[in-house]
Swiss-Prot record:
It is found in: Cellular thylakoid membrane. GO terms for biological process: photosynthesis. It is a single-pass membrane protein. InterPro entries: PSI_PsaM (IPR010010). HAMAP family: PSI_PsaM. It comes from Prochlorococcus marinus subsp. pastoris (strain CCMP1986 / NIES-2087 / MED4). Keywords: Membrane, Photosynthesis, Photosystem I, Thylakoid, Transmembrane, Transmembrane helix. This is Photosystem I reaction center subunit XII. The chain crosses the membrane at residues 9-29.
């Protein structure tokens, strides 16, 4: 069960990175438009 836990942590990390990237892109677009 240890490998599954590590995989879950990796997936959660990727999701967090994806959300951070989307937020950064949104902020960049909003700043560029203004």
């Amino acid at each position: 069960m240890e490998p599954s836990q590590s995989i879950n942590l990796i997936i959660l990390g990727l999701i967090v990175v994806m959300h951070a990237g989307v937020l950064a892109l949104r902020l960049g677009i909003s700043l560029a438009r203004t």
